[in-house]
Design a protein with these regions (language model features):
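Extracytoplasmic/periplasmic substrate-recognition and gating elements
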Residues: 51, 136, 228, 232, ...
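Glycine-centered hinge/linker elements that transmit conformational signals in sensory
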Residues: 174-177, 181, 217-245
Length: 430
């Protein structure tokens, strides 16, 4: 880290009398690793990984800096202002865009690690999500991901004589046939609140219809025929969900307690499904119309800018080490099933193959991994990732638009035009 080092004269004198001491001091370097694993059991896993790394690299010490997710943004800002950012930071691909915009990422160091690991080590489509806005670099080295889609109870669909829905129309048909509001049973648990989850959920349908918030030139493209079709569809689908504003808890609870046999949620529903005792009864499909679109959130390790050369080199070694098969497997398996590997090597390890959760899920983990190439997110167009998408999500315009037409029964065309105008004004300010 960038700190002024005060060395006592007596220490220098005593060191001069010890053979080899001068060389050791010169070569030893300490770096910090900031992450969001505040739970003790996760810190224990990371401690073992660090101990393994330090044994292989006796000249480097790695100190953990666990930070609650809610405090992450504030912590990064505070540390960057004081010139004391940790050399390695765990970050979502969304937050990495913000860091890159503020020039807090050492793009060259990140590229060095990806070169060390090999671009081919990652599943197709993964590195595309961590591309910088100009498409010339990466914002971090991917370590895991979670994806969202449609979960369904196989037995409920089978009992009703319904097959797994493969496209928009089939999904709507299944939801309508299973919808029984008079008995407080609903066709699908669908996010409709003014929340990030609603934006993420709706984005899958929009992107599967080739509707994006930005075009390749960085212009807002909300008020388009493709977006209108997606919004119309989402409203029709929402007619078969629970009344009111549904967010994370409402959607998850409805699926888990049997109120709805289908739900749009992330892979983080799987721990509850496993606890329930019959995970093979749960199927997964993704919104598909003109193409398949999976919402995905990538977690990366990024290397911060402005560090001393030896600290940056140590950080590169540490992140490269973390991508080795057994190490990255230990990282991913802190959340088995919920967190998906993005490095192909994970599934070859005993850590993955022998895990009870992975075994219990049968073919589902492989199916989920196979969806990684289909990850699409608002603001990513080709090889470009527009950093202003963070401002769009922060404004809540998209989720409010969806909420207003589903829960509020607002006119679609008017709402779409008003939302386009709000985002145009927002982008002009930034």
């Amino acid at each position: 880290m960038i700190k002024s080092k005060i060395v006592l004269l007596s220490a220098l004198v005593s060191c001069a009398l010890i053979p080899g001491c001068k060389e050791e001091n010169k070569t030893h370097v300490s770096i910090e690793f900031m992450h969001s694993s505040v739970e003790q059991e996760r810190q224990a896993v990371i401690s073992k990984l660090i101990a393994r790394f330090e044994k292989e690299n006796p000249g480097i010490t790695v100190k953990q800096v666990p930070v609650e997710e809610d405090a992450y943004n504030t912590k990064v800002i505070t540390l960057s202002r004081s010139g004391s950012l940790p050399e390695v930071i765990e970050t979502s691909h969304d937050y990495a865009k913000v860091m890159d915009k503020e020039q807090l990422i050492d793009r060259k160091a990140v590229a060095t690690v990806i070169s060390n690991v090999g671009e081919g080590a990652f599943y197709d489509g993964v590195l595309r999500i961590v591309r910088t806005e100009d498409g010339s670099a990466w914002t971090g080295v991917p370590v895991s991901a979670w994806i969202g889609g449609i979960w369904y109870r196989k037995d409920v669909l089978a009992k009703a004589g319904l097959e797994e829905p493969k496209n928009w129309q089939q999904l709507l048909d299944v939801a309508q046939k299973l919808n029984d509001p008079a008995n407080k049973k609903y066709g699908i648990a669908l996010p409709t609140a003014e929340s990030v989850l609603t934006e993420q959920s709706f984005s899958q349908f929009a992107l599967s219809n080739q509707a994006n918030v930005f075009n390749a030139e960085g212009k807002i493209t909300l008020d388009t025929p493709e977006m209108m079709q997606a919004l119309t569809y989402y409203r029709d689908l929402a007619a078969n969900t629970m009344p009111g504003s549904n967010d994370i808890m409402e959607v998850k609870d409805a699926f888990m307690n049997g109120t709805a046999p289908m739900a749009i949620y992330s892979t983080y529903i799987l721990p509850a499904v496993i606890k329930e005792g019959d995970p093979k009864n749960v199927g997964f499909v993704v919104p598909t119309e003109k193409n398949s679109a999976v919402y995905g959130m990538l977690t990366s390790l990024t290397i911060t800018a402005g560090q001393k050369t030896e600290e940056t080199e140590a950080a590169e070694k540490f992140v490269t080490f973390m991508e080795q098969a057994d190490n990255i497997a230990d990282w991913v398996m802190m959340s088995p099933g919920a967190a998906l590997p993005v490095n192909k090597a994970v599934v070859t390890t005993a850590t993955w193959k022998d895990n009870d959760v992975i075994k219990a899920l049968g073919e589902l983990p492989n199916q989920l991994i196979s969806e990684l190439p289909n990850i699409q997110v608002f603001g990513a167009v080709g090889d470009k990732n527009f950093t202003r998408m963070g401002d769009v999500t922060g404004s809540g315009v998209v989720s409010s638009m969806v909420h207003n037409v589903t829960v509020g029964k607002a006119d679609l065309s008017t709402t779409l035009q008003a939302s386009q105008k709000k985002l145009d004004e927002l982008i002009e300010q930034h």
